[in-house]
Amino acid sequence: MSTAVQFRGGTTAQHATFTGAAREITVDTDKNTVVVHDGATAGGFPLARHDLVKTAFIKADKSAVAFTRTGNATASIKAGTIVEVNGKLVQFTADTAITMPALTAGTDYAIYVCDDGTVRADSNFSAPTGYTSTTARKVGGFHYAPGSNAAAQAGGNTTAQINEYSLWDIKFRPAALDPRGMTLVAGAFWADIYLLGVNHLTDGTSKYNVTIADGSASPKKSTKFGGDGSAAYSDGAWYNFAEVMTHHGKRLPNYNEFQALAFGTTEATSSGGTDVPTTGVNGTGATSAWNIFTSKWGVVQASGCLWTWGNEFGGVNGASEYTANTGGRGSVYAQPAAALFGGAWNGTSLSGSRAALWYSGPSFSFAFFGARGVCDHLILE
């Protein structure tokens, strides 16, 4: 038997302030973990078997996102974050600034930790410029909005900036597969920042400066429900918008979710004019600018632009007989109305975060009916 090698040992608390000498090895007796020291970093660097740390993403606070907005165009990764990249553990012992590209308003950015120890943002969701999917690991992202969130109940401004509630990481994110274009509402659920666009099959359900889907410009038919990728639905009925949201792992909001996501919009006010055809842009002939309808959470055109279908039924009941109003998919008996929320451009003082219409059947379709998606909040261990 060879002579045993012994290391100095100490508790986790003792290790917290111990820097040791360069290349010194100690044992954390509380965690039964080997710790390597560099002579400068308090606490050193705990080691574990590679098969146990592969794909590791560790945060100091599991209940919070790993990033902090530090300015309109700046953000940092939080101290205590540890990320495995290309077989290496990258540890951030202090809040570290994220290297930013030139940011473009209305764009989503992925955040990568790279095997050279840097953290950077990029609009490419496969790999950042100068790196590959092997040498850089996507760990989160954010939306660079065309204006601010509401500070009170009067909407936001038009200064482009990072929406702090859009920050997400791989363990703190929307439950929907694609986190882009979403914002966290009151820590409870995620909402699409923008109204649904016509070309959701390629754009997703929430994208800046695209044609809004409504009763006069209906969305492309879901390829999961019989669509061919190019044909659109015949109208803007509730059935079709609800089907689109299901396609993307989302749903239409209920009344409580809507009043929450729209909080901060300018109340009792509508866009005016003759139409609101584009996300994040003033309506045609608008008397009120798009930004005054931004909510506290950064939901754009939250009210006063289009009535948006809700995920609730009630109000006026249908006829006490079977009615074939489902697009050839069965008949309904005494069906109540499908809810609509928020108010449209022609609603004058009727619009707001609690504005609701409980009159329209789910087969109704008008140019001022649109939709916005929501989904659950996901926190992973």
UniProtKB/Swiss-Prot annotation:
Any Gene Ontology biological process: viral tropism switching
Keyword Translocase in annotation: no
Record keywords: Host-virus interaction, Late protein, Viral attachment to host adhesion receptor, Viral attachment to host cell, Viral receptor tropism switching, Viral tail fiber protein, Viral tail protein, Virion, Virus entry into host cell
Predominant location category: virion
GO cellular component: virus tail, fiber
UniProt key word Disulfide bond: no
Pfam family, one: mtd_2nd
InterPro entries according to UniProt: CTDL_fold, Mtd_2nd, Mtd_N, SUMF_sf
Function: Tail fiber protein located at the distal ends of the fibers that binds to the adhesion receptors on the host surface, thereby determining the host range. The phage can alter its tropism by modifying this protein. Variants are expressed through a diversity-generating retroelement (DGR) that creates mutant copies of a template repeat and replaces the end of the tail fiber receptor-binding protein with these sequences, thus changing the host range. Milliards of variants of the fiber receptor-binding protein can be created with this system.
Domain notes: The C-terminus contains a variable sequence in which nucleotide subtitutions can be introduced at 23 sites by the DGR.
Assembly, per entry: Homotrimer.
Full protein name: Tail fiber receptor-binding protein
